[in-house]
Amino acid sequence: MGTFCSVIKFENLQELKRLCHWGPIIALGVIAICSTMAMIDSVLWYWPLHTTGGSVNFIMLINWTVMILYNYFNAMFVGPGFVPLGWKPEISQDTMYLQYCKVCQAYKAPRSHHCRKCNRCVMKMDHHCPWINNCCGYQNHASFTLFLLLAPLGCIHAAFIFVMTMYTQLYHRLSFGWNTVKIDMSAARRDPLPIVPFGLAAFATTLFALGLALGTTIAVGMLFFIQMKIILRNKTSIESWIEEKAKDRIQYYQLDEVFVFPYDMGSRWRNFKQVFTWSGVPEGDGLEWPVREGCHQYSLTIEQLKQKADKRVRSVRYKVIEDYSGACCPLNKGIKTFFTSPCTEEPRIQLQKGEFILATRGLRYWLYGDKILDDSFIEGVSRIRGWFPRKCVEKCPCDAETDQAPEGEKKNR
């Protein structure tokens, strides 16, 4: 694909810091172990280079490694593309259809979302991937998806090498008996014997690499199918969630309207071409998008504003009655709170007695919300939001009516 024609560019050397994270360290470690062991097993014990098949096999292994690493680093260092700081639409009246990001001090372009990890508004944000320590979005979606495709394919090849190496070295002969047909693989062994014997250490290492290869094939293969489903529908993971909430909002308030997702062009091929191009550069500029008939540039952002307003209506005000340090699994808040801590990268927030929180969602023993600050609406002041134990707060009696919208508001929505 055209992704291979693109050039990895470093805006600055700070991008190299993305490698100093557990995600890339594990990912690159798995790639290194599987590719290195596949080459060693092939050359020493299974398919020697002096045979035609062995040479072709070795070249294919190198090719898999190069393509996997290229798309991996492309996805990591090219990045998703960020909305320019201070961005606003050309027509000033259009700002009424957009949300404002206080951190970036810019309006959120259609399909963009603010990432807490990257601390920027990301174009066509799908998710923040810990394995590349970057977001998956507009500019790197193709490279990321190709990596998800190539990694399982390379691991399947490597797994075949591992299995055949262990089989031929342990049994010295491989035969399939179908009536009178026999396939003799004994020629795959070195004659004379290899310089390095296939001992216990080699067997254990090959078996470990086989486990990594099979696990990667299953896990990354599933992620590839999820991403292809997203691409063919031209709908990111976040946008799928927005669409579901739109349907819930319409059903909850019994509205006489239908939400139509604006970016699905009605053709899987047209949706596919927006991400994968021969030039390696995705269609558009990441700020404006082609939409289906009957929709416009702000169809989705208007729905987001409606959901945000609905979120404020449904939010509940709480007062902090116990201090909370912000620990991930606080044992001093009870055993149930400790073991039911949310499995998410979303932050926990410190609480001090007397503070007020506006909770928007929650679990049985945990709540998620924003601290109510006097200067929370001043431009440039970041919101303080995250998870906290439910037992640390109590509902404010005067705000009990905010648990659900008044009937009058439901009719007006």
Curated annotation (Swiss-Prot):
Residues 1-24, 79-143, 227-413 are cytoplasmic. A motif (Di-lysine motif) lies at residues 410-413. The active site is at 129 (s-palmitoyl cysteine intermediate). It is found in: Endoplasmic reticulum membrane. One of its GO terms (cellular component) is Golgi apparatus. The chain crosses the membrane at residues 25-45, 58-78, 144-164, 206-226. It is a multi-pass membrane protein. Endoplasmic reticulum palmitoyl acyltransferase that mediates palmitoylation of proteins such as AMFR, CALX, ITPR1 and TFRC. Palmitoylates calnexin (CALX), which is required for its association with the ribosome-translocon complex and efficient folding of glycosylated proteins. Mediates palmitoylation of AMFR, promoting AMFR distribution to the peripheral endoplasmic reticulum. Together with SELENOK, palmitoylates ITPR1 in immune cells, leading to regulate ITPR1 stability and function. The DHHC domain is required for palmitoyltransferase activity. This is Palmitoyltransferase ZDHHC6.
